[in-house]
Amino acid sequence: MFLDSFLHKKFFSTIEKKSLLPSKSSLLVAFSGGQDSLTLVKLLYDLNPFYRWRITLIHFDHRWRWDSMLASKQVFSFARYYNFPLYYFECPDYLNTEEASRKWRYTTLIDLAVKNNFTKILLAHTATDSSETLLSNLFRGTSLDGLASIGWSCQLAQSVYIVRPLLNFYRFETSWFCRKYYLPIWVDRSNYDYIMFRNRLRQELVPYIKSYFQPNLEERCYSLSSLVKYDTDFLEQEALRIYFILIHQDLIAINHTALRLLHLSVQSRIFKIFFIANLNFNPNSRQIEDVIIFIKQNILSQINMNNYILVMDDIWFYVGVKIIKFS
C-alpha cells in the first residue's frame, strides 16, 4: 500500500486538496541528493502506481566542492535503482555566485520543460526553508513581500508550472523519512560553512531560539508567512486591476492625478508593475519612493530612472526616451 507512513498520507492529502499533481502529468523533479529531495522522489515513486505520472529527475552539479562528483555518482545510482531517467548539468565556470547559478538553474529547468513537454517542475522546498527565508529577509531588511511564503504553485511559461509539494513538511520530518526508508542522504559539507549567512542562521540561531524562546519557531514562522501571503496576494491583484484602468491606451504612461489618490502601498505596487511591464526593470524601494515623491510635488518636470527619461504633464506620467551612453 502506498500510504504506509504518516508522511505518505500527508503528501497524498496535500496534492489532492490543492490539485498540485494531476494523474498522468509529466514531472521534472530537481534532485540534489539531500534529504528533502530524496523524500520527494521516494513519495512520488510510492504514489506513482496510483497517479501514473511520467517522472524524470534533473541534477545540477555546481562543482563548488571537491566531492561534488561523488555526490553526482550517488545521484546517478539512486536514479538507476528506482529506474528514473536523469538529466545531468554541470554549472559553467563563469557562474561563480549563488544568484548567477540560481538564474542558470531556473533557465535550464524552464527550457528543458518546454522542449520535452514537462508540465510540472517540482522543487523540494519545505516549511523549514520558508521559515529560514523569512528570518533571513527580516534581518537583511525587507518589505511585506519578503515575509510572505513562497507559493505552492506558479506558472513559469505556457503550460509549465513550478510546484513545491513539500511546503508543509519540516526538515525533522524529511530526516525521519530518510532514516525510516534507508535513503542515502548526501551530506553537503558547504552547509556547515559559517561564512555563509544562511548556514549560521540555520545551524546556530534557529536552534538557540527554539531552545530558549520558541520551540515551535518553524511552525510559527510558516504560519506568519502564510498569512502574509494572503494579504500580499490581495494587494498585488488589486494593484494589477487598478493599473489596467489607469494606463494610457497608446503611450507608455499612467494617470498620475488618479494614482495620487490611492494608498501609498497600492501606488508603490502599481509603479513596480509599470516599470517591470514596460521597461523590464524591477525598481528597488528607494527608486519607487523617489517616483512617488516626484509626482506628489506635482511639478511639470522630468527625472532619470535606470537610463530612461520619465516625464510628467498635467495628467500623465510617462516614459520619454532612453539615454544611450557611448564609451
UniProtKB/Swiss-Prot annotation:
Disulfide pattern:
none
Q: What Enzyme Commission number does this protein have?
A: 6.3.4.19
Task: Give Gene Ontology CC terms.
Answer: chloroplast
- GO BP terms: tRNA modification
| Gene Ontology MF terms in the entry | ATP binding; tRNA(Ile)-lysidine synthase activity
Binding positions for ATP per the UniProt entry: 32-37
HAMAP family for this protein = tRNA_Ile_lys_synt
Describe the task this protein carries out.
Ligates lysine onto the cytidine present at position 34 of the AUA codon-specific tRNA(Ile) that contains the anticodon CAU, in an ATP-dependent manner. Cytidine is converted to lysidine, thus changing the amino acid specificity of the tRNA from methionine to isoleucine.
User: What protein family does this chain belong to?
Assistant: Belongs to the tRNA(Ile)-lysidine synthase family.
Q: Per its record, how is this protein called by name?
A: tRNA(Ile)-lysidine synthase, chloroplastic
Give the organism the record lists.
Answer: Porphyra purpurea
